[in-house]
């Protein structure tokens, strides 16, 4: 199934003025587009609310971009039309902005190598000359011993003394990994493009101002690279940076994008440390958490059982290294998320409700999409809409009962 429910509240006695949180995890380009399609389906499922009416927005990686717009009262339709159809009020990120090569670090690599070689060579020469000169008593002894008794043994002893002294030791890495750039691409142009959208549409790019004007709580999650700790940006958290800069830090997927430095601190993709950060939404008082994770591992056995058109697939191992990496990343993200779901299901102190939306485990068409391809945005969005619409239909009875307790009416029938 594409929906997992943790229902712990007393639905017969709904809370007054409950807080509803929308938690959006990562997923790169295809995952972000899949989420937009799914959020459109969720919007259509709800009669008297839409997702931008929620109280708390937590965004991780690609989810941080969508969360930032929703918290600014931009509709899902406008985000979708702009980012997928590329004809709405927002400007979609262009290929040259997304694939902005980290040229500075890449071009510096040969210079670093030459500089280190020059430094090591000069230090070795200086060390050799300073360690082996006629004014050193030990050097004179070794030289005298060889001169008075020239032989292969005395020559070996003399050269060993010259080249094996401690003064010649130079500290340098045994494997020069530090010569590799810290990311293929950089996110500066993505941030600038997003900031232009904010400016042109008069959106709040300040956490404090956004909360003051709208009452919406926006939180963006990244990871502090040097401490491996979760970094949370928000009006009552780290609020000293722009929303678009926090988003830039959150989307910096390791190796693909270089780390983002903000005030001397390096950040990478928030999904590295937490898949969704549902715990933070609950900590901030959310009674109902609607969480959307687009990356779920593919199950070949489930595909064979739920494949009405009889299509056949080769195994993931035979599909190449990209498919293996895709499955590994999805498994890591999904497994952590399931541990969190189990924690709240088993925790007697948790009295809220969680609705987790994901693709089905047999969705091979979405699994096959390149996560970093801008060309697959429309396909991913379509899959997201179809997948979530189908899951909402299948779980309608349970969802209708839970949402009703929070004042949300579900549509009688979905097309």
Where are these regions (language model features)?
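Catalytic cores of secreted/periplasmic lytic hydrolases that degrade extracellular macromolecules
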Residues: 63
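Patatin-like phospholipase
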Residues: 1-60, 68-415
């Amino acid at each position: 199934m594409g929906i997992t429910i943790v229902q712990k509240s007393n639905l017969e006695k709904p809370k007054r003025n409950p807080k509803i949180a929308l938690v959006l995890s990562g997923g790169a380009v295809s995952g972000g587009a899949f989420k937009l399609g799914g959020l459109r389906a969720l919007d259509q499922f709800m009669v008297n609310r839409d997702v931008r009416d929620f109280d708390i927005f937590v965004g991780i990686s690609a989810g941080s971009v969508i969360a930032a717009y929703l918290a600014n009262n931009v509709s899902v339709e406008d985000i979708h039309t702009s980012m997928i159809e590329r004809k709405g009020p927002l400007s979609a990120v262009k290929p040259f902005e997304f694939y902005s090569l980290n040229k500075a670090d890449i071009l510096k690599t040969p210079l670093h190598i030459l500089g280190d070689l020059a430094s090591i060579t000069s230090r070795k020469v200086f060390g050799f000359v300073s360690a082996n000169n006629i004014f050193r008593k030990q050097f004179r002894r070794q030289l005298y011993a060889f001169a008075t008794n020239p032989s292969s043994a005395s020559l070996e002893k003399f050269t060993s003394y010259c080249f094996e002294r401690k003064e010649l030791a130079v500290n340098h890495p045994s494997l020069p990994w530090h010569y590799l750039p810290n990311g293929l691409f950089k996110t500066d142009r993505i941030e600038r493009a997003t900031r232009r959208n904010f400016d042109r549409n008069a959106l709040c790019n300040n956490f404090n101002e956004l909360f003051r004007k709208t009452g919406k709580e926006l939180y963006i999650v990244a990871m502090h690279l040097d401490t491996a700790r979760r970094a949370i940006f928000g009006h009552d958290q780290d609020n000293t940076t722009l929303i678009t800069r926090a988003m830039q830090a959150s989307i910096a997927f390791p190796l693909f994008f270089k780390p983002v430095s903000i005030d001397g601190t390096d950040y990478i993709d928030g999904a590295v440390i937490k898949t969704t950060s549902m715990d933070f939404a609950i900590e901030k008082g959310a009674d109902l958490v609607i969480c959307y994770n687009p990356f779920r591992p593919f199950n070949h056995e489930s595909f064979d059982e739920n494949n009405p058109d009889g299509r056949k697939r080769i195994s993931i191992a035979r599909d190449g290294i990209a498919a293996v990496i895709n499955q590994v990343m999805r498994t890591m993200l999904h497994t952590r998320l399931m541990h969190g779901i189990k924690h709240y299901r088993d925790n007697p102190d948790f009295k809220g409700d969680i609705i987790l939306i994901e693709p089905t485990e047999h969705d091979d068409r979405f699994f096959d999409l390149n996560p970093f391809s801008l060309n697959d945005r429309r396909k991913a969005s379509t899959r997201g809409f179809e997948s979530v619409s189908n899951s909402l239909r299948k779980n309608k009875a349970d969802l209708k009962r839970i949402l009703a307790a929070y004042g949300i009416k579900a549509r009688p029938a979905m097309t």
